[in-house]
Amino acid sequence: MKQKVVSIGDINVANDLPFVLFGGMNVLESRDLAMRICEHYVTVTQKLGIPYVFKASFDKANRSSIHSYRGPGLEEGMKIFQELKQQFGVKVITDVHEASQAQPVSEVVDVIQLPAFLARQTDLVEAMARTGAVINVKKPQFVSPGQMGNIVEKFKEAGNDQVILCDRGSNFGYDNLVVDMLGINVMVQATGGHPVIFDVTHALQCRDPFGAASGGRRAQVAELARAGMAVGLAGLFIEAHPEPNSAKCDGPSALPLDKLEPFLVQMKAIDDLVKSFPALDTSK
C-alpha cells in the first residue's frame, strides 16, 4: 500500500518517513512556561535532526472537574502561539472543541486537533475540514482502530484529506487504558495509508475511579514509547513539563523536561533501525 504524505509546511508526515515529534505541554499554563518548554524542544530536536511541531491546548474543555484549570482561552492562547511561532519558527498544533473555534484557530496554528471524545461529532468535523488545515484526529478510547476509516471519510467528504490519525489507547475495563500495537497498522489499512502517530503521554493515563483528575504511569513512558516506535510510526506525541508533579493538567503522565533528550535519542535510534528494514510480507 502506498503511504499518504501529509505536509505541515516543510515537514512531511508519513508512515514510511522518519518520525515527526509532536510535543510540548498539555495546556498553556503561562506565556513564560510555554516559551521555556518550546525552546527546549526546539533545541533538542534540532540537535538530533527530528522534525518538530509544538503542542499545547488553549482550553481543556473536557476536564473531569469543573474546578480544574482549563487554560488561558482562545484569544490569549492564540497570542502565545503567534509569539512562539515568531520567536522559534516552530509549527504549532492545538485542539478545538467547538465548530466556531475551527476557523480562528486555523488562522494561527498549523495543525488543528480533533479531541478523542469529539471525534464522531459531524458538525465539528465539517467545520474543521472547511478550514483546509492539516487535521490530527485522536482515536477515541471507545472506538476500534478499524472504525477510524469512517472518521477520515467524513473529512474527505467535507473536502479535506490532509488527515493524520493518533492512537492514545483503548478502554480496558474501567479507568484503564491499553495500547493495541496491532491496531496501529489496522488504522493505516482502514484509511488507505494515512499517517498514524502515537500519543504515549495520554496512553499512560490511569484514573482513580473517584478522583477529579487523571493519574498516570510516568515511570513506564520509555517502554511504551519504545514499543510504539518498533511498529513503525509516522510520528510520536509526547508532553513534558519541568516539574510534572506541579503541572496543572496530566502531570502524572508527563515526561520530565530534562529527560527529553535522552528519551528522544532512544526513539530516533529505534525509528532509524525499523525503517531501514526491507518490507516483509508475511500474509502469504
Swiss-Prot record:
Its EC number is 2.5.1.55. It comes from the Bacteria. GO terms for biological process: keto-3-deoxy-D-manno-octulosonic acid biosynthetic process. It holds the Pfam family DAHP_synth_1. The keyword Cytoplasm applies. Pathway: Carbohydrate biosynthesis; 3-deoxy-D-manno-octulosonate biosynthesis; 3-deoxy-D-manno-octulosonate from D-ribulose 5-phosphate: step 2/3; Bacterial outer membrane biogenesis; lipopolysaccharide biosynthesis. It is found in: Cytoplasm. InterPro entries: Aldolase_TIM, DAHP1/KDSA, KDO8P_synthase. One of its GO terms (cellular component) is cytosol. GO terms for molecular function: 3-deoxy-8-phosphooctulonate synthase activity. It is an enzyme of class 2 (transferase). The keyword Cytoplasm applies. It catalyses: D-arabinose 5-phosphate + phosphoenolpyruvate + H2O = 3-deoxy-alpha-D-manno-2-octulosonate-8-phosphate + phosphate. Keywords: Cytoplasm, Lipopolysaccharide biosynthesis, Transferase. Belongs to the KdsA family. This is 2-dehydro-3-deoxyphosphooctonate aldolase. It comes from Yersinia pestis. The gene is kdsA.
